[in-house]
Amino acid sequence: MPTLFLFGASEGGLFDFDATLPLMAVQVVLLTFILNALFFKPVGRVVEEREDYVNTSRAEAKKKIAEVELLETELKDQLKEARLEAQKVILEAEQDSENLYKEALALATSEANASREKARREIDSQRDEALNQLKNEADNLGDLIIERLLAKK
């Protein structure tokens, strides 16, 4: 019956103190150096390069975001100024239009008044002429009537 105790273990086992255990330890250390030189250092270098690339990209992205925010602020200011300028131009155009309307209305009113006054003077002149003509005709008729009356006598 095999015993389960270490003291009673047969030779050639894992915990024998012959050259196997130190040889395995040397193999592990040697494998560690080889893996370190062939795998871990290149992978570590690639990881560091990638980390540097990511950090650089993030820094550039932050810089570009700051530039974009600055440009956005400037463009908003320019847009605000343009809107104010447009409102000012519109207001000036409305005022100019109102002034032109008032001037045109005043000119039309003055022309209408002048035309009305001219027509009134012409009517007065024609009325005076008609009255003078009627007076002359009345005088002529009166003279004619008097002559005929005197001629009958």
UniProtKB/Swiss-Prot annotation:
InterPro entries: ATP_synth_b (IPR034679), ATP_synth_B-like_membr_sf (IPR028987), ATP_synth_b/b'su_bac/chlpt (IPR002146), ATP_synthase_B_chain (IPR050059). The chain crosses the membrane at residues 20-40. Signal peptide: none annotated. Pfam families: ATP-synt_B (PF00430). The keyword Transferase does not apply. Its main location: membrane. Keywords: ATP synthesis, CF(0), Hydrogen ion transport, Ion transport, Membrane, Thylakoid, Transmembrane, Transmembrane helix, Transport. F(1)F(0) ATP synthase produces ATP from ADP in the presence of a proton or sodium gradient. F-type ATPases consist of two structural domains, F(1) containing the extramembraneous catalytic core and F(0) containing the membrane proton channel, linked together by a central stalk and a peripheral stalk. During catalysis, ATP synthesis in the catalytic domain of F(1) is coupled via a rotary mechanism of the central stalk subunits to proton translocation. Belongs to the ATPase B chain family. This is ATP synthase subunit b'. It comes from Prochlorococcus marinus (strain NATL2A). The lineage of its organism: Bacteria, Bacillati, Cyanobacteriota, Cyanophyceae, Synechococcales.
